[in-house]
């Protein structure tokens, strides 16, 4: 059992675990709610879990202040669907104005993007990931349960026009559903300056049968890209475990997130906080650690920072997905993926 470091004596300059990994990147979920019904995430739609409220604006401010003092440079605002929060734009502004935070990003299903891209950018958002699992409108509907393909694509155009530093498209690899879409995606990014991210399907507590039916190894896509002349790019400190590829004939780039590949966790650089204030050292840990009790007053910040540093002592070297251990993650919307 690790003893908590003494307040006032712990080195608060950098979040670092026992394996030498430094954590520059916070993924902050602000809601579990989502208006899409993606088959790999919320096939039955969003169902509220209990009465515990989501983090308030003041709690988020204190949380970001503590993380930023401990080396966090990038914050990604996630959900659920983060734009469902009425104060979403205020949260963007809060993150953007937090000292030491260099990059504010979000991941969205894109249904509000066309109308709000410029306002979000003006508030301080600089990077955006849009979930588009298929470029076939019929398959898009089959996967998401929403007939909003054209609306989401207009949102991507609006994001590019608004001046975002980077626009990424997230597509979960699904055998038998979108697994034949690679040529269509490649054709699209030939003249589109976006980063296309193929994400290998991960097993969750409520999705074991779905995983067995639709899991497609990302290594298959990687091998095809290499055969087609795509080159592996040098990793950036904030990239984490993603493998990024570029090709001289394409404006867009491709990223692969392959959690089942050997050494995936070696370059882990992120921590997660759920919408209800639980710290998760890994997407697939057994338990979250409550932080909300230390987000009530600024005077609690030293104790909050000490708790964060203490908990990193419990972070394991790697997840246990290969053993079918998915931890507390019943579905990806619960923590933000």
UniProtKB/Swiss-Prot annotation:
Pathway: Cofactor biosynthesis; molybdopterin biosynthesis. S-adenosyl-L-methionine binds at residues 40, 80, 131, 202. CDD domains: Radical_SAM, Twitch_MoaA. SMART domains: Elp3 (SM00729). [4Fe-4S] cluster 1 binds at residues 34, 38, 41. GO terms for biological process: Mo-molybdopterin cofactor biosynthetic process. The keyword GTP-binding applies. Pfam families: Fer4_12 (PF13353), Mob_synth_C (PF06463), Radical_SAM (PF04055). One of its GO terms (molecular function) is metal ion binding. Belongs to the radical SAM superfamily. MoaA family. PANTHER family: GTP 3',8-CYCLASE, MOLYBDOPTERIN COFACTOR SYNTHESIS PROTEIN A. HAMAP family: MoaA_B. NCBIfam families: moaA (TIGR02666). Monomer and homodimer. This is GTP 3',8-cyclase.
């Amino acid at each position: 059992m690790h003893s908590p470091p003494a307040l006032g004596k712990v080195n608060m300059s950098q979040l670092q675990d026992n394996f030498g990994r430094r954590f520059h990147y916070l993924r902050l979920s602000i809601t579990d709610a989502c208006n899409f019904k993606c088959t790999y995430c919320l096939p039955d739609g969003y169902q509220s879990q209990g009465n515990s409220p989501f983090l308030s604006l003041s709690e988020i401010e204190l949380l970001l202040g503590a993380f930023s003092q401990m080396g966090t440079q990038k914050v990604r605002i996630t959900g659920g669907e983060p734009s469902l929060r009425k104060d979403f734009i205020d949260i963007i502004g809060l993150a953007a104005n937090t000292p030491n935070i260099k990059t504010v990003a979000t991941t969205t299903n894109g249904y509000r993007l066309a109308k709000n891209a410029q306002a979000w950018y003006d508030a301080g958002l600089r990077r955006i990931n849009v979930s588009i699992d298929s470029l076939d409108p019929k398959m898009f509907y089959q996967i998401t349960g929403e007939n909003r393909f054209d609306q989401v694509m207009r949102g991507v155009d609006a994001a590019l026009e608004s001046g975002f530093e980077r626009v990424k498209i997230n597509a979960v690899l699904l055998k038998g559903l979108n697994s034949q879409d690679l040529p269509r995606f490649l054709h699209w990014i030939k003249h589109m300056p976006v980063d296309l991210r193929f994400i290998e399907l991960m097993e969750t507590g409520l999705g074991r049968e779905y995983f067995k039916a639709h899991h497609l190894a990302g290594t298959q896509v990687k091998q095809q890209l290499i055969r087609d002349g795509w080159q592996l790019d040098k990793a950036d400190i904030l990239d984490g475990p993603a493998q990024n590829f570029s090709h001289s004939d394409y404006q867009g780039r491709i990223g692969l997130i392959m959690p089942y590949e050997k050494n995936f966790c070696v370059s882990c650089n992120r921590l997660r906080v759920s919408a209800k204030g639980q710290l998760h050292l890994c997407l697939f840990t057994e338990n979250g650690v409550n932080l909300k009790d230390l987000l009530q007053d600024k005077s609690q910040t030293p104790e909050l920072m000490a708790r964060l540093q203490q908990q990193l002592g419990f972070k394991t070297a790697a997840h246990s997905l290969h053993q079918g251990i998915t931890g507390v993650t019943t579905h990806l919307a619960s923590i933000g993926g």
